[in-house]
Amino acid sequence: MGRPSKRIREIAKSLDAAKAYTIREAIDILKKCPPVKFDQTVEVSLKLGVDPRRSDQSVRGTVSLPNGTGKTMKILVFAKGDKVKEALEAGADYAGHDELLEKVNGGWTDFDAVVATPDMMREVGKLGKVLGPRGLMPTPKAGTVTTDIAKAIQELKAGKIEFKLDRHGVINNGVGKVSFESNKLEENIRAFLIAIQRAKPASAKGHYMRSLAISSTMGPGLKIDLRESDLAAKES
């Protein structure tokens, strides 16, 4: 890991490294950090008390953030016939089959989400080396393999995101922009935590949510006191 930038080191001097903040306190600190030339993403990093090596302790799902992500989503749809027209009319940025399959296979990834009709998955599945590492492979569980193309596009445009446990037992996701009002960011973060709580595997024992940190793209990472939130502290 590289050395923190001078900017981060200066910000860190004003923070108590031992303190666990409330969600609202952390948001307010990030918003008061010196501005940069772009609207930073607010990111959540959550360590879970599960074993990522066990298939019965996988944590994965989706959540519709109540205030969106603040990001303009570029959506690619793999479909044929009338579904291509339906996709474009619903707001897809790209829609089609053979030409797009070939383009993605060549390494093109100028999009943020992929939706596919079930009949396209045999071909889309062959793009695993390109889509998989970027978390872009459509799945039925995420609602991105569907015949209801319009609904899937509308949900993604409105702020539906997918979360997935990594090999270290951590979930990392963007949940909004620094420019959002504090209460809207807090609503998004709490909706995100509720979704992860509901996705708790039945086989998971002990404390489920182990630690939580909130950061911005160019800002510090702030430890959150999970006890201040009933939903995060509660063990079911």
Curated annotation (Swiss-Prot):
<dbReference type="InterPro" id="IPR005878">
    <property type="entry name" value="Ribosom_uL1_bac-type"/>
</dbReference>
<comment type="similarity">
    <text>Belongs to the universal ribosomal protein uL1 family.</text>
</comment>
<comment type="subunit">
    <text>Part of the 50S ribosomal subunit.</text>
</comment>
<keyword id="KW-0820">tRNA-binding</keyword>
<dbReference type="InterPro" id="IPR002143">
    <property type="entry name" value="Ribosomal_uL1"/>
</dbReference>
<keyword id="KW-0687">Ribonucleoprotein</keyword>
<dbReference type="InterPro" id="IPR023674">
    <property type="entry name" value="Ribosomal_uL1-like"/>
</dbReference>
<dbReference type="GO" id="GO:0003735">
    <property type="term" value="F:structural constituent of ribosome"/>
</dbReference>
<keyword id="KW-0678">Repressor</keyword>
<dbReference type="GO" id="GO:0019843">
    <property type="term" value="F:rRNA binding"/>
</dbReference>
<keyword id="KW-0699">rRNA-binding</keyword>
<keyword id="KW-0689">Ribosomal protein</keyword>
<dbReference type="Pfam" id="PF00687">
    <property type="entry name" value="Ribosomal_L1"/>
</dbReference>
<dbReference type="GO" id="GO:0015934">
    <property type="term" value="C:large ribosomal subunit"/>
</dbReference>
<dbReference type="InterPro" id="IPR023673">
    <property type="entry name" value="Ribosomal_uL1_CS"/>
</dbReference>
<dbReference type="InterPro" id="IPR016095">
    <property type="entry name" value="Ribosomal_uL1_3-a/b-sand"/>
</dbReference>
<comment type="function">
    <text>Binds directly to 23S rRNA. The L1 stalk is quite mobile in the ribosome, and is involved in E site tRNA release.</text>
</comment>
<protein>
    <recommendedName>
        <fullName>Large ribosomal subunit protein uL1</fullName>
    </recommendedName>
</protein>
<dbReference type="InterPro" id="IPR028364">
    <property type="entry name" value="Ribosomal_uL1/biogenesis"/>
</dbReference>
<dbReference type="GO" id="GO:0006417">
    <property type="term" value="P:regulation of translation"/>
</dbReference>
<dbReference type="GO" id="GO:0006412">
    <property type="term" value="P:translation"/>
</dbReference>
<keyword id="KW-0810">Translation regulation</keyword>
<comment type="function">
    <text>Protein L1 is also a translational repressor protein, it controls the translation of the L11 operon by binding to its mRNA.</text>
</comment>
<dbReference type="GO" id="GO:0000049">
    <property type="term" value="F:tRNA binding"/>
</dbReference>
<keyword id="KW-0694">RNA-binding</keyword>
